[in-house]
Amino acid sequence: MTSHEEAPTESENTAAGTPEAPPAGPLGWALLFARVAAWLVVPIYFVGMVVLIILERRIGSSGEGLVEGLVLFVGFGVFAVVGGLLVAKRPGNPVGWILSGASLLVPVAAGETYAAYVMTTRGEPDWLAVVGVWANSWYWFMCVALAFIFLPLLFPDGRLPSRRWLPVAVISGVGVLIVVVLGMLSDTLRGQNVDYTVENPIGIEGLAHVEELPFFAVLSGPLLVGCLGAVAAVVVRFRRSRG
Protein backbone atom coordinates (compact mmCIF):
# COMPACT_ATOMS: atom_id res chain seq x y z
CA MET A 1 0.00 0.00 0.00
CA THR A 2 1.50 3.35 -1.01
CA SER A 3 1.31 6.53 1.03
CA HIS A 4 -1.50 7.78 -1.27
CA GLU A 5 -3.77 4.76 -0.67
CA GLU A 6 -6.44 4.91 2.01
CA ALA A 7 -6.98 2.19 4.60
CA PRO A 8 -10.07 0.05 4.01
CA THR A 9 -13.18 1.03 5.91
CA GLU A 10 -15.07 -1.26 8.34
CA SER A 11 -17.76 -1.89 5.72
CA GLU A 12 -15.11 -2.85 3.16
CA ASN A 13 -13.50 -5.18 5.68
CA THR A 14 -16.85 -6.82 6.37
CA ALA A 15 -17.55 -7.25 2.65
CA ALA A 16 -14.12 -8.79 2.17
CA GLY A 17 -14.69 -11.21 5.02
CA THR A 18 -12.28 -9.49 7.41
CA PRO A 19 -13.70 -9.50 10.95
CA GLU A 20 -14.23 -6.15 12.61
CA ALA A 21 -12.23 -5.30 15.69
CA PRO A 22 -14.27 -5.52 18.90
CA PRO A 23 -15.40 -2.16 20.30
CA ALA A 24 -12.98 -0.65 22.77
CA GLY A 25 -13.78 0.82 26.17
CA PRO A 26 -16.88 0.19 28.32
CA LEU A 27 -18.95 -0.98 25.34
CA GLY A 28 -16.44 -3.69 24.54
CA TRP A 29 -16.44 -4.89 28.14
CA ALA A 30 -20.25 -4.87 28.20
CA LEU A 31 -20.41 -7.00 25.05
CA LEU A 32 -17.81 -9.39 26.47
CA PHE A 33 -19.83 -9.72 29.68
CA ALA A 34 -22.99 -10.41 27.68
CA ARG A 35 -21.28 -13.15 25.67
CA VAL A 36 -19.85 -14.82 28.76
CA ALA A 37 -23.21 -14.60 30.53
CA ALA A 38 -24.97 -16.06 27.50
CA TRP A 39 -22.66 -19.08 27.48
CA LEU A 40 -23.12 -19.67 31.22
CA VAL A 41 -26.92 -19.46 31.48
CA VAL A 42 -27.76 -22.95 30.19
CA PRO A 43 -24.99 -24.87 32.04
CA ILE A 44 -25.77 -23.13 35.33
CA TYR A 45 -29.48 -23.82 34.95
CA PHE A 46 -29.13 -27.52 34.20
CA VAL A 47 -26.41 -28.12 36.81
CA GLY A 48 -28.57 -26.37 39.40
CA MET A 49 -31.62 -28.45 38.50
CA VAL A 50 -29.62 -31.69 38.64
CA VAL A 51 -28.32 -30.74 42.09
CA LEU A 52 -31.89 -29.99 43.16
CA ILE A 53 -33.12 -33.40 42.00
CA ILE A 54 -30.24 -35.22 43.72
CA LEU A 55 -30.83 -33.40 47.01
CA GLU A 56 -34.57 -34.07 46.88
CA ARG A 57 -33.86 -37.78 46.55
CA ARG A 58 -31.40 -37.63 49.44
CA ILE A 59 -34.05 -36.24 51.80
CA GLY A 60 -36.84 -38.37 50.36
CA SER A 61 -38.81 -35.38 49.09
CA SER A 62 -40.45 -35.39 45.68
CA GLY A 63 -40.96 -31.62 45.68
CA GLU A 64 -43.61 -30.99 43.07
CA GLY A 65 -45.48 -33.83 41.42
CA LEU A 66 -43.87 -35.63 38.49
CA VAL A 67 -45.87 -33.80 35.82
CA GLU A 68 -45.55 -30.42 37.50
CA GLY A 69 -41.83 -30.91 38.03
CA LEU A 70 -41.30 -31.94 34.41
CA VAL A 71 -43.22 -28.93 33.13
CA LEU A 72 -41.18 -26.66 35.40
CA PHE A 73 -37.88 -28.25 34.33
CA VAL A 74 -38.60 -28.12 30.59
CA GLY A 75 -40.38 -24.76 30.64
CA PHE A 76 -37.63 -22.85 32.38
CA GLY A 77 -35.07 -24.85 30.42
CA VAL A 78 -36.54 -23.27 27.30
CA PHE A 79 -36.29 -19.91 29.05
CA ALA A 80 -32.58 -20.55 29.66
CA VAL A 81 -31.83 -21.59 26.06
CA VAL A 82 -33.80 -18.79 24.40
CA GLY A 83 -32.60 -16.25 26.94
CA GLY A 84 -28.97 -17.20 26.41
CA LEU A 85 -29.32 -16.92 22.64
CA LEU A 86 -30.98 -13.51 22.88
CA VAL A 87 -28.35 -12.20 25.28
CA ALA A 88 -25.63 -13.34 22.87
CA LYS A 89 -27.28 -11.92 19.75
CA ARG A 90 -29.24 -8.95 21.14
CA PRO A 91 -27.66 -7.93 24.46
CA GLY A 92 -29.48 -4.61 24.36
CA ASN A 93 -32.89 -6.29 24.45
CA PRO A 94 -34.05 -6.80 28.05
CA VAL A 95 -36.18 -9.80 27.05
CA GLY A 96 -33.11 -12.05 26.86
CA TRP A 97 -31.95 -10.95 30.29
CA ILE A 98 -35.43 -11.46 31.75
CA LEU A 99 -35.64 -14.99 30.36
CA SER A 100 -32.15 -15.79 31.60
CA GLY A 101 -32.75 -14.27 35.03
CA ALA A 102 -36.04 -16.10 35.53
CA SER A 103 -34.50 -19.43 34.55
CA LEU A 104 -31.52 -18.97 36.87
CA LEU A 105 -33.76 -18.16 39.83
CA VAL A 106 -35.50 -21.55 39.66
CA PRO A 107 -32.44 -23.63 40.73
CA VAL A 108 -32.19 -21.41 43.82
CA ALA A 109 -34.61 -23.96 45.30
CA ALA A 110 -31.60 -26.29 45.54
CA GLY A 111 -30.29 -24.07 48.33
CA GLU A 112 -33.37 -24.68 50.48
CA THR A 113 -33.27 -28.40 49.69
CA TYR A 114 -29.65 -28.46 50.81
CA ALA A 115 -30.70 -26.73 54.02
CA ALA A 116 -33.36 -29.40 54.54
CA TYR A 117 -30.72 -32.10 54.01
CA VAL A 118 -28.36 -30.49 56.52
CA MET A 119 -31.10 -30.03 59.12
CA THR A 120 -32.31 -33.62 58.83
CA THR A 121 -28.82 -35.13 58.97
CA ARG A 122 -26.96 -32.78 61.34
CA GLY A 123 -29.63 -30.75 63.10
CA GLU A 124 -27.60 -27.53 62.81
CA PRO A 125 -27.31 -25.36 59.68
CA ASP A 126 -24.01 -24.32 58.17
CA TRP A 127 -23.63 -20.97 56.44
CA LEU A 128 -24.59 -22.37 53.03
CA ALA A 129 -27.79 -23.83 54.45
CA VAL A 130 -28.68 -20.47 55.99
CA VAL A 131 -28.11 -18.70 52.67
CA GLY A 132 -30.16 -21.34 50.86
CA VAL A 133 -33.23 -21.15 53.09
CA TRP A 134 -32.91 -17.34 53.21
CA ALA A 135 -33.00 -17.11 49.40
CA ASN A 136 -35.99 -19.45 49.40
CA SER A 137 -37.97 -16.86 51.37
CA TRP A 138 -38.01 -14.37 48.50
CA TYR A 139 -36.67 -15.72 45.19
CA TRP A 140 -39.97 -17.12 43.89
CA PHE A 141 -41.70 -13.73 44.01
CA MET A 142 -38.96 -12.27 41.82
CA CYS A 143 -39.07 -15.22 39.44
CA VAL A 144 -42.85 -14.95 39.01
CA ALA A 145 -42.61 -11.20 38.43
CA LEU A 146 -39.98 -11.62 35.72
CA ALA A 147 -41.75 -14.49 33.95
CA PHE A 148 -45.38 -13.42 34.21
CA ILE A 149 -45.28 -9.63 34.45
CA PHE A 150 -42.21 -8.05 32.88
CA LEU A 151 -41.69 -10.61 30.12
CA PRO A 152 -45.20 -10.14 28.65
CA LEU A 153 -44.99 -6.38 29.16
CA LEU A 154 -41.73 -6.06 27.21
CA PHE A 155 -42.02 -8.89 24.70
CA PRO A 156 -40.77 -9.02 21.95
CA ASP A 157 -38.73 -5.83 21.40
CA GLY A 158 -37.90 -5.01 25.01
CA ARG A 159 -40.18 -1.98 25.07
CA LEU A 160 -43.56 -1.25 26.62
CA PRO A 161 -46.48 -1.06 24.15
CA SER A 162 -46.59 2.70 24.85
CA ARG A 163 -45.72 5.20 27.58
CA ARG A 164 -49.17 4.71 29.08
CA TRP A 165 -48.00 1.30 30.28
CA LEU A 166 -45.21 2.80 32.37
CA PRO A 167 -47.36 3.11 35.55
CA VAL A 168 -48.17 -0.61 35.32
CA ALA A 169 -44.48 -1.49 35.18
CA VAL A 170 -43.57 0.91 38.00
CA ILE A 171 -46.41 -0.13 40.33
CA SER A 172 -45.74 -3.83 39.87
CA GLY A 173 -41.98 -3.31 40.17
CA VAL A 174 -42.32 -1.41 43.45
CA GLY A 175 -44.75 -4.03 44.77
CA VAL A 176 -42.37 -6.88 43.95
CA LEU A 177 -39.45 -5.02 45.52
CA ILE A 178 -41.38 -4.52 48.78
CA VAL A 179 -42.42 -8.18 48.93
CA VAL A 180 -38.87 -9.37 48.20
CA VAL A 181 -37.33 -7.11 50.86
CA LEU A 182 -39.89 -8.21 53.47
CA GLY A 183 -39.12 -11.82 52.58
CA MET A 184 -35.41 -11.17 53.06
CA LEU A 185 -35.99 -9.64 56.50
CA SER A 186 -38.42 -12.15 58.01
CA ASP A 187 -37.44 -13.11 61.54
CA THR A 188 -37.47 -16.89 61.16
CA LEU A 189 -36.67 -18.88 58.03
CA ARG A 190 -38.46 -22.17 57.56
CA GLY A 191 -38.34 -25.20 55.31
CA GLN A 192 -40.64 -25.73 52.40
CA ASN A 193 -41.15 -29.50 52.19
CA VAL A 194 -39.34 -30.44 55.41
CA ASP A 195 -40.38 -28.98 58.76
CA TYR A 196 -37.48 -26.98 60.23
CA THR A 197 -36.72 -23.40 61.20
CA VAL A 198 -33.55 -21.32 61.02
CA GLU A 199 -32.93 -17.92 62.56
CA ASN A 200 -32.44 -15.20 59.97
CA PRO A 201 -29.13 -13.41 60.73
CA ILE A 202 -30.44 -10.21 59.10
CA GLY A 203 -34.09 -10.67 60.10
CA ILE A 204 -36.24 -8.14 61.94
CA GLU A 205 -37.43 -9.50 65.27
CA GLY A 206 -41.11 -10.42 65.17
CA LEU A 207 -41.49 -9.96 61.41
CA ALA A 208 -43.50 -12.91 60.13
CA HIS A 209 -43.06 -14.64 56.79
CA VAL A 210 -44.27 -12.31 54.06
CA GLU A 211 -47.24 -14.50 53.12
CA GLU A 212 -48.42 -14.50 56.75
CA LEU A 213 -48.35 -10.73 57.18
CA PRO A 214 -51.82 -9.26 57.84
CA PHE A 215 -51.36 -6.77 55.01
CA PHE A 216 -50.12 -9.32 52.46
CA ALA A 217 -53.41 -8.91 50.57
CA VAL A 218 -52.56 -5.23 50.14
CA LEU A 219 -49.07 -6.11 48.94
CA SER A 220 -50.61 -8.49 46.41
CA GLY A 221 -52.46 -5.59 44.80
CA PRO A 222 -49.51 -4.27 42.75
CA LEU A 223 -48.69 -7.81 41.64
CA LEU A 224 -52.27 -8.29 40.48
CA VAL A 225 -52.08 -4.98 38.61
CA GLY A 226 -48.90 -6.18 36.93
CA CYS A 227 -50.38 -9.54 35.91
CA LEU A 228 -53.53 -7.95 34.48
CA GLY A 229 -51.44 -5.34 32.71
CA ALA A 230 -49.20 -8.04 31.25
CA VAL A 231 -52.19 -9.90 29.83
CA ALA A 232 -53.61 -6.67 28.43
CA ALA A 233 -50.25 -5.82 26.83
CA VAL A 234 -50.18 -9.17 25.02
CA VAL A 235 -53.73 -8.60 23.75
CA VAL A 236 -52.87 -5.09 22.55
CA ARG A 237 -49.77 -6.26 20.69
CA PHE A 238 -51.70 -9.12 19.10
CA ARG A 239 -54.42 -6.79 17.84
CA ARG A 240 -51.84 -4.36 16.47
CA SER A 241 -50.09 -7.16 14.61
CA ARG A 242 -53.36 -8.06 12.91
CA GLY A 243 -54.00 -4.46 11.90
Give the label of every model feature segment.
Residues T2-G243:
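Alpha-helical transmembrane segments of multi-pass integral membrane proteins
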